Amino acid sequence: MAVTFIFKAVGKQFTAMVLFCVFILPYKALAQNVDLFKMQDEQDKKEAKEKTDITTSIFKTTRLVNGQTIENTGQGVLDVKISHRFGTVNTGSYNFYGLDQATMRIGLDYGVTNRLEIGIGRSTYNKEFDGFFKYRILRQSTGKINMPLSVSWVSTGIWRSLHDQPEPYTLNSSDHFYFANQVILARKFNDYFSLQLVPTMVHYNIVPTQYIKNDFLSTGIGFRGRISKRVNLTGEYYYQLNRYPGTYNSLSLGVNIETGGHVFQFFLTNSTGINESSFITQTNGQWEKGYIHFGFNISRVFTMVKPKSTIKN
């Protein structure tokens, strides 16, 4: 009897332990897991707030069509750019709708740091030489530093070497200079759309008459719309607040195609010139009258100096 009693007591305890393991322990473990998940989620949110994520690829290259974008060439990277503009399509079949004529520019852009870019170039239009620097002042970011916009400053100097002044006038070398200063304000709204505004001032060292101002103000607007991983639609428009006589606002629409280290840009524009002084203040054709140029830009990057990970820009 005593043995039977002991077995019954042990059996009841064993049954209680089984029930505890089956019903109570999983519940407690689940509750602990939920608490752990909550703690991990809170930790992730805390780390995200303490970390700053810089927004990248607002635009796919440093030139939208004619104008600069917010993007910089990376540190130690050389960007070779070839820009080509054919004649206007309204010249007809005799000039093969503009393909018999061409204006081009070749440029070299180099990233000194991830914030500072410098560049030089030569254009056939007015035989212009140009140089510029671009500095990224603010970078769009989220997290610890929440910055809704990216902001850059661009200063460009252009020297016109074309000898076309009428006799008996003689211009000094400094009279052939133009300067452009720009502030670029850009935002990447999502992976499919980016927008930028570009307030601009172009200065002429000399103008034909005293009735024409030396300084010209304009505002540019540009966008990028993503179609696929490697294809984007682009557009830019520069509105002149005070126009050079006989000129119109520059409008360009295009498509960008990425292929490895190359970016191909194909577009239509009413601007013949490629530098800021040329396409902003010297566009003399209108879209509605067929003064449209087909053009393309080719960009190829080369890593000249591999930056050290310890370098802060």
Name every feature range the model reports, one short phrase each:
Residues 1-11:
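N-terminal secretory signal peptides that target proteins for export/translocation
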Residues 19-25:
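Hydrophobic core
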Residues 32-169, 177-181, 186-197, 201-205, ...:
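Transmembrane beta-barrel domains of Gram-negative outer membranes and organellar outer membranes
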Residues 26-31:
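Sec/Tat signal peptide C-region and signal peptidase I cleavage site
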Residues 214, 246-248:
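Membrane-helix boundary/juxtamembrane motif in polytopic membrane proteins
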Residues 168-173, 210:
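Flexible, glycine/proline-enriched loop segments at strand-loop-helix junctions
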Residues 192-239:
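A mid-sequence, solvent-exposed acidic-amphipathic segment
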Residues 12-19, 56:
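Sec-dependent N-terminal signal peptides
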